[in-house]
Each structure stands twice: as structure tokens, then as C-alpha cells.
Amino acid sequence: MRCPFCQDAENKVIDSRESHEGSVIRRRRECLTCKRRFTTYERVEELYPLIVKKDGRREAFDREKIVNGLKKACEKRPVSADQLEETVVAIERQLQGMGEKEVPSSVIGEEIMRRLRQLDEVAYVRFASVYRSFRDIAEFMDELKALREAEAREQRQAPPSAPVDKGG
């Protein structure tokens, strides 16, 4: 590893730590020539399947497409950057866990929608309106109705919450 300051290859590791749930090793290094310190990150090479588009084209997985889609959907919503990153990482892990060489883009789109629905309903509807190419307000309203019906089903299936003791 070359020093980013003097380009010398001689350096020593002064500290190593795991980060990002153990998937990355952060190393603090000191150049033996110029004595300046710098940080490097080591991670396992991630292999993703090819993405098969609706028209049959195949392209390499592009994390930034997911990030950008989520950012647009969540713009001006109470969703933190950490929540977006966790969502992207979860989708990446799911793709890697499939063990497939090719995955239809629809699988990724549906997974994004599933996760957005749990994260923020407005962001979910925004994403769905683009992803599903709503043609008019009726399709938009149908999606909202389906969202409300799913919520009602989930509430009926949820175990009742324990009564709150009001200290009386």
C-alpha cells in the first residue's frame, strides 16, 4: 500500500478495527518515510449477479441506481442517510445471498418497494408511481387503496398490545 502523500510503499499498521458489521477492516497506517498517517479499508470483493432488464438487456449491478432511486423517493421525508444505507446494504446482501448469475430487475424493484413500504409510505408511493409507471390518478389511487388494505390486514393480524398501566 503506497503512502498517498509521498508515494513510498513502506508503512506500518498502527491500528486495525472492524467496521460496518464486520464486513470491513479499517486500518490506520503510518508511512515509514514521511511519518504521515493515513487510513485504508479492506473488504471482501463483492460479486453481484447481472441484472436482466425488462427488454432483455443485461447489465452489471449498479449500487448507485438503487441509492439514487431511494434518495428521490425519500426526498424531504423523515428518512435518515443511515436508514437509506441500511436499506441498500440489505438489498445487496439479498442479491449476493441468492447465488444467481442473473436476476431480473423486477426482483430488485419489488424488494425496494417492500422495504420502502416499511420505511416510509409516502416514499413508497413515490417510488411505486415511477416504478409501476402510473398513467393516471386512478392508478395512483388504486395503489393507495392497496396500501391501506395491507395496513388494515397487518393490524388485524398483529397480536394485541399489552394494556398500559397508568399507575392508578
Curated annotation (Swiss-Prot):
Record note on cofactor: Binds 1 zinc ion.
Cofactor field: Zn(2+)
Superkingdom, taxonomy of origin: Bacteria
ATP-cone domain sequence ranges: 49-139
Entry keyword annotation includes Methyltransferase: no
Zinc-finger among keywords: yes
Chain intervals annotated as zinc finger (unnamed): 3-34
Example GO BP: negative regulation of DNA-templated transcription
GO terms of molecular function: ATP binding; DNA binding; zinc ion binding
Keywords noted in UniProt: ATP-binding, DNA-binding, Metal-binding, Nucleotide-binding, Repressor, Transcription, Transcription regulation, Zinc, Zinc-finger
Protein function: Negatively regulates transcription of bacterial ribonucleotide reductase nrd genes and operons by binding to NrdR-boxes.
Family per record: Belongs to the NrdR family.
Protein name: Transcriptional repressor NrdR
